[in-house]
Amino acid sequence: MRWRREALSHLVKAASWLSSLDLPVRLIAFPEGALQGFNDEVLDLDHATFAREGAIDIPGEETEFLGTIAKEYGAFVIAQAKARHPDLKDRFFNVGFIINPRGKVILQHYKVSPLFPVEHSVCPHDVYDWWVEKYGRNLQAFWPVVDTEIGRLGIMMANEGSYPENARALALNGAEVVYRASYPHPATGNEMFEIQSRARALDNNLYVVAPNMGTYYLFPEETTPIDTFGGRSFIINYKGQIVGRQDYGAGSTYVGGVVDIEALRDHRARAQWDNWMKDLRTELYQLLYEKPIYPKNLYLKRAPMKHKEYREKVIKRQIRLMHDRGIWVKPAR
Protein backbone atom coordinates (compact mmCIF):
# COMPACT_ATOMS: atom_id res chain seq x y z
CA MET A 1 0.00 0.00 0.00
CA ARG A 2 2.98 2.33 0.56
CA TRP A 3 3.82 2.75 -3.12
CA ARG A 4 0.15 3.32 -3.91
CA ARG A 5 0.01 6.11 -1.34
CA GLU A 6 3.08 7.71 -2.87
CA ALA A 7 1.55 7.52 -6.34
CA LEU A 8 -1.70 9.11 -5.16
CA SER A 9 0.17 11.83 -3.28
CA HIS A 10 2.25 12.70 -6.35
CA LEU A 11 -0.81 12.74 -8.60
CA VAL A 12 -2.70 15.07 -6.25
CA LYS A 13 0.29 17.38 -6.05
CA ALA A 14 0.51 17.73 -9.84
CA ALA A 15 -3.24 17.95 -10.39
CA SER A 16 -3.83 20.50 -7.63
CA TRP A 17 -0.91 22.67 -8.66
CA LEU A 18 -2.06 22.99 -12.27
CA SER A 19 -5.79 23.16 -11.53
CA SER A 20 -5.29 25.91 -8.95
CA LEU A 21 -3.91 28.19 -11.66
CA ASP A 22 -7.57 28.81 -12.48
CA LEU A 23 -9.46 28.57 -9.17
CA PRO A 24 -8.70 27.13 -5.72
CA VAL A 25 -9.06 23.35 -5.51
CA ARG A 26 -11.79 22.52 -3.00
CA LEU A 27 -12.70 18.95 -4.00
CA ILE A 28 -10.38 16.02 -4.77
CA ALA A 29 -12.02 12.82 -6.02
CA PHE A 30 -10.19 9.51 -6.38
CA PRO A 31 -11.76 6.87 -8.63
CA GLU A 32 -13.26 3.65 -7.35
CA GLY A 33 -10.39 1.15 -7.11
CA ALA A 34 -7.68 3.72 -6.40
CA LEU A 35 -6.87 2.20 -3.00
CA GLN A 36 -7.36 -1.54 -3.58
CA GLY A 37 -7.96 -2.22 -7.26
CA PHE A 38 -10.53 -4.86 -8.19
CA ASN A 39 -8.64 -8.10 -7.64
CA ASP A 40 -11.38 -9.57 -5.46
CA GLU A 41 -13.69 -9.29 -8.46
CA VAL A 42 -11.28 -10.23 -11.25
CA LEU A 43 -9.93 -13.27 -9.40
CA ASP A 44 -13.36 -14.34 -8.07
CA LEU A 45 -12.01 -14.49 -4.52
CA ASP A 46 -13.87 -15.97 -1.58
CA HIS A 47 -15.93 -13.26 0.10
CA ALA A 48 -15.17 -14.11 3.73
CA THR A 49 -11.45 -14.47 3.05
CA PHE A 50 -11.26 -11.08 1.36
CA ALA A 51 -13.32 -9.53 4.15
CA ARG A 52 -10.70 -10.68 6.65
CA GLU A 53 -7.55 -10.10 4.59
CA GLY A 54 -8.26 -7.44 1.97
CA ALA A 55 -11.06 -5.18 3.18
CA ILE A 56 -10.32 -2.16 5.36
CA ASP A 57 -11.98 -0.39 8.27
CA ILE A 58 -13.48 3.10 7.98
CA PRO A 59 -12.18 5.16 9.67
CA GLY A 60 -8.79 3.52 9.63
CA GLU A 61 -5.23 3.74 8.39
CA GLU A 62 -6.24 4.42 4.78
CA THR A 63 -8.71 7.19 5.60
CA GLU A 64 -6.12 8.72 7.91
CA PHE A 65 -3.73 8.91 4.95
CA LEU A 66 -6.38 10.54 2.75
CA GLY A 67 -7.15 12.87 5.63
CA THR A 68 -3.59 14.18 5.50
CA ILE A 69 -4.17 15.06 1.84
CA ALA A 70 -7.42 16.81 2.72
CA LYS A 71 -5.69 18.85 5.41
CA GLU A 72 -2.66 19.67 3.27
CA TYR A 73 -4.76 21.05 0.41
CA GLY A 74 -7.66 22.41 2.44
CA ALA A 75 -10.01 20.34 0.29
CA PHE A 76 -12.73 17.75 0.60
CA VAL A 77 -11.69 14.26 -0.50
CA ILE A 78 -13.99 11.61 -1.97
CA ALA A 79 -12.78 8.04 -2.35
CA GLN A 80 -13.90 4.40 -2.20
CA ALA A 81 -12.87 1.15 -0.56
CA LYS A 82 -14.04 -2.39 0.02
CA ALA A 83 -14.66 -2.12 3.75
CA ARG A 84 -15.90 -4.16 6.67
CA HIS A 85 -18.93 -3.30 8.78
CA PRO A 86 -18.27 -3.53 12.54
CA ASP A 87 -21.53 -5.42 13.13
CA LEU A 88 -21.25 -8.03 10.36
CA LYS A 89 -18.49 -10.60 10.72
CA ASP A 90 -16.74 -11.88 7.56
CA ARG A 91 -18.64 -9.50 5.31
CA PHE A 92 -17.54 -6.47 3.34
CA PHE A 93 -19.34 -3.69 1.51
CA ASN A 94 -18.30 -1.33 -1.26
CA VAL A 95 -18.14 2.01 0.52
CA GLY A 96 -17.75 5.50 -0.85
CA PHE A 97 -16.72 8.11 1.70
CA ILE A 98 -16.10 11.83 2.05
CA ILE A 99 -13.39 13.44 4.18
CA ASN A 100 -13.54 17.11 5.15
CA PRO A 101 -10.57 19.54 5.09
CA ARG A 102 -9.91 18.76 8.75
CA GLY A 103 -9.30 15.10 7.89
CA LYS A 104 -12.53 13.69 9.32
CA VAL A 105 -14.79 11.17 7.56
CA ILE A 106 -18.15 12.96 7.32
CA LEU A 107 -20.11 10.58 5.08
CA GLN A 108 -20.14 6.88 4.26
CA HIS A 109 -22.27 5.52 1.43
CA TYR A 110 -22.74 1.77 1.11
CA LYS A 111 -23.10 0.91 -2.57
CA VAL A 112 -26.65 -0.28 -3.30
CA SER A 113 -26.10 -1.65 -6.83
CA PRO A 114 -22.96 -3.79 -7.21
CA LEU A 115 -21.73 -4.68 -10.69
CA PHE A 116 -23.35 -8.02 -11.43
CA PRO A 117 -22.19 -10.75 -11.71
CA VAL A 118 -18.55 -9.99 -10.93
CA GLU A 119 -18.69 -7.85 -7.78
CA HIS A 120 -18.77 -9.74 -4.49
CA SER A 121 -19.69 -6.85 -2.20
CA VAL A 122 -22.70 -7.08 0.08
CA CYS A 123 -25.08 -4.16 -0.38
CA PRO A 124 -27.81 -2.79 1.94
CA HIS A 125 -30.57 -4.40 -0.14
CA ASP A 126 -28.87 -7.79 0.30
CA VAL A 127 -29.38 -7.47 4.07
CA TYR A 128 -32.42 -5.24 3.81
CA ASP A 129 -34.32 -6.24 6.95
CA TRP A 130 -31.19 -5.91 9.10
CA TRP A 131 -30.29 -2.58 7.48
CA VAL A 132 -33.71 -1.02 7.97
CA GLU A 133 -33.81 -2.12 11.60
CA LYS A 134 -30.41 -0.53 12.22
CA TYR A 135 -30.56 2.62 10.05
CA GLY A 136 -34.23 3.16 9.25
CA ARG A 137 -36.16 3.27 5.99
CA ASN A 138 -35.45 6.71 4.60
CA LEU A 139 -33.35 8.37 1.92
CA GLN A 140 -30.46 9.14 4.25
CA ALA A 141 -30.18 5.45 5.18
CA PHE A 142 -29.52 4.39 1.58
CA TRP A 143 -28.48 7.54 -0.31
CA PRO A 144 -26.84 9.81 2.27
CA VAL A 145 -26.02 13.45 1.50
CA VAL A 146 -23.83 15.78 3.54
CA ASP A 147 -24.18 19.58 3.59
CA THR A 148 -20.81 21.34 3.33
CA GLU A 149 -19.45 24.81 2.59
CA ILE A 150 -18.85 23.75 -1.05
CA GLY A 151 -22.34 22.31 -1.55
CA ARG A 152 -24.36 19.23 -0.73
CA LEU A 153 -22.33 16.13 -1.61
CA GLY A 154 -23.46 12.59 -2.36
CA ILE A 155 -22.07 9.37 -3.84
CA MET A 156 -23.24 7.12 -6.68
CA MET A 157 -20.52 4.61 -7.52
CA ALA A 158 -20.00 2.89 -10.86
CA ASN A 159 -22.94 0.59 -11.57
CA GLU A 160 -25.20 2.64 -9.30
CA GLY A 161 -25.25 5.22 -12.06
CA SER A 162 -26.68 2.62 -14.44
CA TYR A 163 -30.00 2.97 -12.63
CA PRO A 164 -31.68 6.41 -12.82
CA GLU A 165 -33.35 5.80 -9.46
CA ASN A 166 -30.08 6.17 -7.55
CA ALA A 167 -29.34 9.63 -8.92
CA ARG A 168 -32.94 10.70 -8.39
CA ALA A 169 -32.83 9.48 -4.78
CA LEU A 170 -29.70 11.53 -4.11
CA ALA A 171 -31.25 14.58 -5.75
CA LEU A 172 -34.45 14.24 -3.73
CA ASN A 173 -32.27 14.02 -0.64
CA GLY A 174 -30.76 17.38 -1.56
CA ALA A 175 -27.57 16.45 -3.45
CA GLU A 176 -25.91 19.08 -5.63
CA VAL A 177 -22.60 17.37 -6.44
CA VAL A 178 -22.51 13.61 -6.95
CA TYR A 179 -19.41 11.42 -7.25
CA ARG A 180 -19.76 8.70 -9.89
CA ALA A 181 -16.74 6.41 -10.41
CA SER A 182 -15.48 4.03 -11.97
CA TYR A 183 -16.75 2.24 -15.10
CA PRO A 184 -14.92 -0.40 -17.18
CA HIS A 185 -14.21 -0.64 -20.87
CA PRO A 186 -15.94 -1.38 -23.29
CA ALA A 187 -18.68 0.61 -21.51
CA THR A 188 -16.44 3.67 -21.72
CA GLY A 189 -15.45 3.22 -25.35
CA ASN A 190 -19.04 2.73 -26.49
CA GLU A 191 -20.04 5.90 -24.57
CA MET A 192 -22.33 4.16 -22.07
CA PHE A 193 -20.47 5.75 -19.14
CA GLU A 194 -20.73 9.23 -20.66
CA ILE A 195 -24.37 8.93 -21.72
CA GLN A 196 -25.45 7.68 -18.30
CA SER A 197 -23.47 10.27 -16.36
CA ARG A 198 -24.67 13.20 -18.46
CA ALA A 199 -28.27 12.00 -18.28
CA ARG A 200 -28.13 11.68 -14.48
CA ALA A 201 -26.76 15.22 -14.22
CA LEU A 202 -29.35 16.67 -16.59
CA ASP A 203 -32.33 14.78 -15.17
CA ASN A 204 -31.63 16.01 -11.66
CA ASN A 205 -29.87 19.36 -12.25
CA LEU A 206 -26.76 18.34 -10.34
CA TYR A 207 -23.02 18.12 -10.97
CA VAL A 208 -21.55 14.68 -11.63
CA VAL A 209 -17.86 14.21 -10.87
CA ALA A 210 -16.81 11.02 -12.65
CA PRO A 211 -13.11 10.11 -12.35
CA ASN A 212 -12.28 6.79 -13.99
CA MET A 213 -9.47 4.37 -13.19
CA GLY A 214 -6.10 4.38 -14.90
CA THR A 215 -3.99 1.29 -15.46
CA TYR A 216 -3.24 -1.11 -12.64
CA TYR A 217 -1.27 -4.27 -11.91
CA LEU A 218 -3.23 -7.46 -11.38
CA PHE A 219 -0.43 -9.19 -9.43
CA PRO A 220 2.51 -7.73 -7.46
CA GLU A 221 5.05 -9.45 -9.73
CA GLU A 222 3.54 -8.08 -12.96
CA THR A 223 5.60 -5.57 -14.95
CA THR A 224 2.94 -4.54 -17.46
CA PRO A 225 -0.08 -2.58 -16.19
CA ILE A 226 -3.49 -3.18 -17.74
CA ASP A 227 -5.92 -0.51 -18.87
CA THR A 228 -9.30 -2.18 -18.42
CA PHE A 229 -11.23 1.06 -17.91
CA GLY A 230 -10.50 3.10 -21.01
CA GLY A 231 -10.19 6.55 -19.47
CA ARG A 232 -12.90 9.11 -20.23
CA SER A 233 -13.13 10.88 -16.90
CA PHE A 234 -15.61 13.75 -16.72
CA ILE A 235 -16.95 16.63 -14.72
CA ILE A 236 -20.51 17.35 -15.85
CA ASN A 237 -22.64 20.34 -14.92
CA TYR A 238 -26.29 20.57 -13.94
CA LYS A 239 -27.37 20.89 -17.59
CA GLY A 240 -25.59 17.72 -18.64
CA GLN A 241 -22.72 19.63 -20.26
CA ILE A 242 -19.13 18.44 -19.88
CA VAL A 243 -17.01 21.09 -18.15
CA GLY A 244 -13.96 18.86 -17.63
CA ARG A 245 -12.87 15.90 -19.74
CA GLN A 246 -9.90 13.51 -19.80
CA ASP A 247 -10.00 10.81 -22.48
CA TYR A 248 -6.62 9.30 -21.60
CA GLY A 249 -6.67 6.17 -19.46
CA ALA A 250 -3.42 4.25 -20.00
CA GLY A 251 -1.49 5.71 -17.12
CA SER A 252 -1.89 8.14 -14.24
CA THR A 253 -3.69 11.37 -15.03
CA TYR A 254 -6.45 13.70 -13.82
CA VAL A 255 -9.38 15.86 -14.89
CA GLY A 256 -10.21 19.31 -13.56
CA GLY A 257 -13.16 21.64 -13.94
CA VAL A 258 -15.25 24.34 -12.30
CA VAL A 259 -18.21 23.42 -10.09
CA ASP A 260 -20.43 26.50 -9.76
CA ILE A 261 -22.88 25.76 -6.96
CA GLU A 262 -24.46 29.22 -7.04
CA ALA A 263 -25.24 28.84 -10.74
CA LEU A 264 -26.85 25.47 -10.02
CA ARG A 265 -28.96 26.92 -7.22
CA ASP A 266 -29.97 29.86 -9.37
CA HIS A 267 -31.05 27.54 -12.20
CA ARG A 268 -33.11 25.37 -9.86
CA ALA A 269 -34.83 28.45 -8.42
CA ARG A 270 -35.31 30.44 -11.63
CA ALA A 271 -36.01 27.99 -14.47
CA GLN A 272 -39.62 27.36 -15.45
CA TRP A 273 -39.18 24.16 -17.43
CA ASP A 274 -35.86 22.32 -17.14
CA ASN A 275 -35.66 22.20 -13.34
CA TRP A 276 -37.49 18.90 -13.67
CA MET A 277 -37.88 17.64 -10.12
CA LYS A 278 -40.46 20.23 -9.10
CA ASP A 279 -42.92 18.58 -11.51
CA LEU A 280 -42.67 14.94 -10.38
CA ARG A 281 -46.09 13.26 -10.43
CA THR A 282 -45.20 10.91 -7.63
CA GLU A 283 -48.61 9.24 -7.28
CA LEU A 284 -48.27 7.97 -10.85
CA TYR A 285 -44.67 6.82 -10.58
CA GLN A 286 -45.34 4.77 -7.46
CA LEU A 287 -47.17 2.29 -9.69
CA LEU A 288 -43.85 1.37 -11.29
CA TYR A 289 -42.48 -0.19 -8.14
CA GLU A 290 -45.41 -1.92 -6.46
CA LYS A 291 -44.20 -5.36 -7.57
CA PRO A 292 -40.73 -6.38 -6.36
CA ILE A 293 -38.24 -7.37 -9.06
CA TYR A 294 -34.79 -8.03 -7.59
CA PRO A 295 -34.92 -10.14 -4.39
CA LYS A 296 -34.09 -8.42 -1.13
CA ASN A 297 -32.19 -10.12 1.73
CA LEU A 298 -30.25 -12.27 -0.74
CA TYR A 299 -27.24 -12.42 1.58
CA LEU A 300 -28.91 -12.05 4.94
CA LYS A 301 -28.04 -15.65 5.83
CA ARG A 302 -25.26 -16.55 3.40
CA ALA A 303 -22.11 -15.13 1.82
CA PRO A 304 -22.25 -13.56 -1.66
CA MET A 305 -22.07 -15.96 -4.58
CA LYS A 306 -19.14 -16.38 -6.91
CA HIS A 307 -19.48 -15.52 -10.60
CA LYS A 308 -20.77 -18.83 -11.99
CA GLU A 309 -23.25 -19.48 -9.19
CA TYR A 310 -24.64 -15.95 -9.46
CA ARG A 311 -25.20 -16.27 -13.19
CA GLU A 312 -27.01 -19.56 -12.73
CA LYS A 313 -29.09 -18.75 -9.66
CA VAL A 314 -29.82 -15.04 -10.02
CA ILE A 315 -29.29 -13.63 -13.51
CA LYS A 316 -31.10 -16.43 -15.33
CA ARG A 317 -33.94 -16.26 -12.81
CA GLN A 318 -34.30 -12.49 -13.22
CA ILE A 319 -34.45 -12.74 -17.00
CA ARG A 320 -37.05 -15.48 -16.71
CA LEU A 321 -39.07 -13.24 -14.36
CA MET A 322 -39.15 -10.45 -16.95
CA HIS A 323 -40.35 -12.89 -19.59
CA ASP A 324 -42.93 -14.51 -17.31
CA ARG A 325 -44.44 -11.11 -16.42
CA GLY A 326 -44.69 -10.21 -20.08
CA ILE A 327 -42.39 -7.22 -19.66
CA TRP A 328 -39.83 -8.59 -22.11
CA VAL A 329 -40.53 -10.68 -25.22
CA LYS A 330 -38.42 -13.79 -25.66
CA PRO A 331 -36.14 -13.79 -28.71
CA ALA A 332 -37.12 -16.04 -31.61
CA ARG A 333 -33.99 -18.15 -31.13
Describe each model-derived feature in a short phrase.
Residues M1-R2, E41-H47, E221-I226:
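Short, flexible/disordered intra-domain loops and linkers
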Residues R4-A7, F76, F142-V145, K330-R333:
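Eukaryotic scaffold repeat domains enriched in small/polar residues
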Residues R5, S9-R102, I106-Y110, P117, ...:
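Cys-nucleophile CN-hydrolase/nitrilase-fold catalytic domain and related Cys-dependent amidase chemistry
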Residues Q36, I106, S162-P164, Y216, ...:
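Short, acidic Gly/Pro/Ser/Thr-rich loop/turn segments
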Residues A55-I78, R152, A158-G256, A332:
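CN hydrolase (nitrilase-like) catalytic-core segments centered on the catalytic cysteine
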Residues N212-R333:
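C-terminal beta-strand edge segments of enzyme domains
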